[in-house]
């Protein structure tokens, strides 16, 4: 009886932990970055907070992978991730941060050339719609991200991304002050 009770408790704990595990944001198996700047400023507008937050995001191409870093405006890193073979892994001792992975994956979607989006996010799980100044990704028939390009693609580094799961909007612009590290 005690053994049965103990194994039942373990089973419940495992189910609870599995429920807490978050779904990774969509990333392509093969990375097709188009005109990706290495450094951008991202203003995060969260409907649940009063003030927007500004981050610096740095992307570094490494042999077969992309290294993603996010810093506050004082230069302190708060997230470091490596994307290799369609999988995220930690870079250094920073803890995993699902919210930041969502931002990084959304940026990767925005920086994928339109001709490569169908290959990068194949059906039936994903549905990609590309309009002149708006790109939409649906995952399992649900809106995931909408990218809206400011001034169309004439200025490909000015855009915003709406994360439909959280309601957060990220406004992206090139880093204009190289002194911010």
Residue ranges with predicted function:
Residues 15-19:
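C-terminal motif of bacterial Sec signal peptides marking the signal peptidase cleavage site
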